[in-house]
């Protein structure tokens, strides 16, 4: 029997609040996804705090919007960001996301920009030591999350971003870290599109917690440098997005698809137009 992608997409499609500009009322983001018939949302901390956690919880409950992800905890190489996990776990207990994203943080400390607190040892990037040090912090977060019935989603980060974004980089290595606990992986196509395990993991693994997707922007040397919306005049989809989306849509479980793009990627493009067109553009790819 032919798969009814349109019907499945109605329930599985999510969109992340990262695309929403700070100068537009966050309420209009929720209003926009409701108008577009999108039933799920990914949230980042700045958006949650701008909206107000209690007001946001009420709005999501009233409109029966499911939270697919809260972003992010971790950042093991930057103590300021690492210490935010207690606050974020408290948000998660109220908003009940499918997963809370873990980003491991860059070798030189935390998220962009690179931390000024980090010191190189003899000007050497000691990747092995950094991963070993981070492992104990990761296991601590796993334990704390389990105590509060929160599922974490560890996100493999593309190796080209090891300096400033994340130092757990492959699906296989991240899978080893969650195989004996309740936690899962978030697969972001921007970071994992080159991974040798991507296809089989998306199709079959019970450890998939969420697929985040967008089109990818490459520079003149075909290095990934950002994200693009799916369809626009002269906008080529360089990845076979259809294949990856279908892999998740054909699964019999409740794994969702979260469109993730940043405000810095879309610049002056009206986010409301992106949201209203998203479902149609995905179906055109399928």
Language-model segments: what does each one mean?
Residues 15, 43, 70, 102, ...:
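Conserved beta-strand positions
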Residues 8, 31, 41, 143-235:
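Acidic/histidine-rich catalytic cores of soluble enzymes
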Residues 64, 104-106, 215-217, 261:
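Short, small-residue-rich loop/turn micro-motifs
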Residues 3-7, 78-184, 194, 246, ...:
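Active-site acidic/histidine proton-transfer and metal-coordination neighborhood
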């Amino acid at each position: 029997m032919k798969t009814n992608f349109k019907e499945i997409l109605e329930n599985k499609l999510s969109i992340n609040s990262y695309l929403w500009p700070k100068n537009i009322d966050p309420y209009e983001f929720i209003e926009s996804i409701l108008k577009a018939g999108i039933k799920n949302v990914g949230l980042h901390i700045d958006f949650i705090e701008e909206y107000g956690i209690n007001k946001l919880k009420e709005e999501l409950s009233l409109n029966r919007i499911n939270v697919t992800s809260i972003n992010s905890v971790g950042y093991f190489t930057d103590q300021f960001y690492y210490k935010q996990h207690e606050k974020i776990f408290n948000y998660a207990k109220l908003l009940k996301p499918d997963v809370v994203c873990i980003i491991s943080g860059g070798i030189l400390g935390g998220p962009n920009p690179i931390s000024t607190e980090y010191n190189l040892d003899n000007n050497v990037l000691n990747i092995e030591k950094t991963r070993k040090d981070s492992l104990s912090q990761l296991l601590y977060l796993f334990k704390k999350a389990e105590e509060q019935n929160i599922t974490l989603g560890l996100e493999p980060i593309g190796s080209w971003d090891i300096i400033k974004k994340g130092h757990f980089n492959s699906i296989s290595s991240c899978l080893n870290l969650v195989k004996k606990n309740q936690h899962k992986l978030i697969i972001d196509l921007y970071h994992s599109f080159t991974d040798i395990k991507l296809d089989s993991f998306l199709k079959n693994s019970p450890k998939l917690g969420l697929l985040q997707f967008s089109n990818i922007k490459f520079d003149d040397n075909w290095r990934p440098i950002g994200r693009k919306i799916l369809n626009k005049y002269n906008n080529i989809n360089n990845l076979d997005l259809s294949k990856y989306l279908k892999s998740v849509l054909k699964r019999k479980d409740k794994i969702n698809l979260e469109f993730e793009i940043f405000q810095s990627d879309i610049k002056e493009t009206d986010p409301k137009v992106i949201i209203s067109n998203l479902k149609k553009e995905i179906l055109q790819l399928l």
